[in-house]
Structure formats: C-alpha cells, structure tokens
Design a protein with these regions (language model features):
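Juxtamembrane boundary at the C-terminal end of a transmembrane helix
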Residues: 293-302
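Transmembrane alpha-helices that form the ion-translocation and gating core
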Residues: 18-22, 26, 67-97, 170-215, ...
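Entry/N-cap segments of selected transmembrane alpha helices
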Residues: 3-14, 57-82, 110, 114, ...
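Alpha-helical membrane segments and immediately flanking helix-loop junctions
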Residues: 48, 53, 197-237, 249-283
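Interfacial helix-loop-helix linkers and transmembrane-helix boundary segments
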Residues: 4, 25-36, 52-69, 89-107, ...
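N-terminal signal-anchor module of multipass membrane proteins
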Residues: 1-23, 30, 42
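Hydrophobic transmembrane alpha-helices of secondary-active transporters
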Residues: 13-21, 36-61, 120-125, 139-162, ...
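Structural signature of hydrophobic alpha-helical transmembrane segments
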Residues: 2-15, 36-37, 67-78, 133-147, ...
Length: 302
C-alpha cells in the first residue's frame, strides 16, 4: 500500500504542474523555468549524499558501474535495433545528413556537469562524515518538486496534434520494447540481479534524476545506484549514437535517446537529422518522460 501511495504522490505532482501551467502568477512561472535547468544538479548532489553510505556497505562498488554500463549498452542498442526493424518493415529507407563536432562537445560537457554534481555530493558527504556529522537531504521531497516542475514544462512543450500519427508513435514503442529486450540480454550476463528488476531498471529511458530516487524508495539503495548510473550512461550513449549514426538512421537514434530526445539530444536531432525529425523527437521524448516515472514506480512496487 505504501508503494502505491508513493506512486500516487509522483503522479499528483506531475499532473498538478501540467494543470496549473498558465494559471500560476507570471513571476512564479518565470522563476520555475529559471530553476528547472539547475534543479537536476541539486537532485544529483542530494542523491550522491544519500548513496555515499550505500557505497561503504557494498563489498565491490565497481560492480554497480559495470552492471549499469552493461545494461545501458544493451538497452540503447535494443531500442535502436527494435525501432530500425519496425520502420524497415514499413519500407522506410536510411536518411542523409551531418553533425558537427562542436555540438557533440557541448552535449558531452553538459553530461559532465551531472558527474561533477555527483562528485560534489559525494565529497560533501565524506567531508561531513569526517567531522562526525551525517548529512541528510530528503531526495524524495526534492523529486516531488522536480515532478511538479516537469509537469509545468510538459504543458508548454510545443506539441502539435498533426504530429500524433501512428508512425511517429513507433519511435517510443521501439524504445520500450528494445529496452525490455536489452534487459533480457543483460540478465544472461548478470544473473545476480533478478530479471524483473532488470526490466524495471530498463524502463528509466535516460531519466536519471528520477529513477535513482524512485527505485531507492521502492526497492533498495543498491538497485537505486544502478538505476542512476544506468540512465546517466544511457544519456551519454544517446549523444554518441546521434553523432555516429543519427544522420543515417534518425528514427532509431531518437528511439535510443529515450526521454532525452526532447531536451538534451534535441539540438543534435535538429542538426544531424533535420527539422523533419523534430516531431519524432518531441513526441517520443514527451511520451517516455511521462511513462518513465509511472512504469518504473509500478514495476518497483510489484
């Protein structure tokens, strides 16, 4: 029952943000949108503080990185291949395009900020522990605020009804199915983690600031750490895929980008794939951003 109460809180905050958009005072809306880009880093600092105690209790903490990296590789490739097969069956042909190294560098620098935030949080936790004081920040309450801000942001996303055709919906479908297939493959190499937990971890779609906290609350801190690192790695792989093969297989690259397609990797979609594929990225990113907290929470509660 507690699990469903936590899921309900997430959905209520997301829905409140969506419904209250354009109804809040203008100054408060402006403040919310100014805070949103930096709120992720605040969350990551808080997550690192919370997970620092977990790392001390784990005999081989490098296993977290190994398992997360393997799962991220398999789910990213799974999403790419699954989307490719779906569109290949419809007779779609590869595209042509290009991407600049400057855009790739800028995207990777933005990803590095996330790792810096994690390192800062871990450093603060270790420093305070050295002075005999234990830092504690409620990551769950921060996540609820973040979900409200995400709801506001989604309400202002420029989605056009003409974009909602069944071909575009195959992009997020490919991500969902491919991620599940990737979890099955990972299960063969990582028998120490139950298959149902790997499937749950695979459904974060790169939404790292949410999955780590939700999985920690509903399962345990060990799986929460894997969830966080898995989705961080997925975001990195999304950028790499978009650069290497996004210009040739845009729909598949967008699918592997998961929830990041409507924010972090969107500039690369625009340049590498062209404006024709912006609707694919926006619709897929929107759907997966909404589904991620719901699916992960439900699977974690089972």
């Amino acid at each position: 029952m507690q699990s469903f109460w936590l899921i309900f809180q997430l959905l209520i905050c997301l829905a409140l943000g969506f419904v209250l958009a354009r109804r809040l005072p203008k100054w408060l809306e402006r403040l919310s949108f100014q805070i949103l880009p930096y709120f992720t880093y605040i969350l990551l600092i808080a997550i690192a503080i919370e997970f620092s105690t977990t790392l001390h209790s784990i005999a081989e903490p490098w296993q977290i990185l190994n398992h997360a990296a393997l799962l991220a590789v398999m789910t990213s490739i799974g999403a790419f291949v699954c989307c490719y097969v779906l569109f290949k069956l419809l007779g779609y042909q590869p595209s042509h395009g290009k991407v600049s190294m400057s855009l790739v560098s800028k995207s990777l620098i933005n990803i590095s900020y996330a790792f810096i935030a994690l390192a800062l949080g871990y450093g603060l936790a270790e420093l305070s522990s050295g002075f005999g004081y234990t830092l504690h920040i409620s990551t769950w309450n921060l996540l609820l605020v973040f979900m409200f801000l995400i709801g506001l942001d989604l309400a202002y996303s420029p989605l056009d009804r003409s974009w909602l055709n069944w071909q575009i919906l195959l992009v997020p479908l490919g991500c969902i199915l491919g991620s599940i297939i990737g979890a099955f493959v990972t299960g063969y190499f990582v028998p120490s983690i139950q298959l149902k937990d790997l499937i749950m971890l695979s459904q974060g779609y790169g939404f790292y600031s949410m999955t780590g906290i939700v999985v920690t609350e509903l399962k345990n801190a060990h799986l929460g750490s894997i969830a966080l690192m898995n989705d961080l790695f997925r975001e990195i792989f999304a950028i790499v895929f978009m650069y290497i093969i996004g210009w040739r297989y845009p729909r598949s690259a967008i699918s592997s980008a998961g929830a990041t397609a409507m924010d972090v990797t969107l500039p690369m979609v625009k340049q590498a794939c062209g404006n024709d594929f912006i609707p694919h990225a926006m619709v897929s990113g929107f759907i997966l951003s909404v589904l991620a907290p719901i699916v992960v929470s439900v699977l974690a509660a089972l």
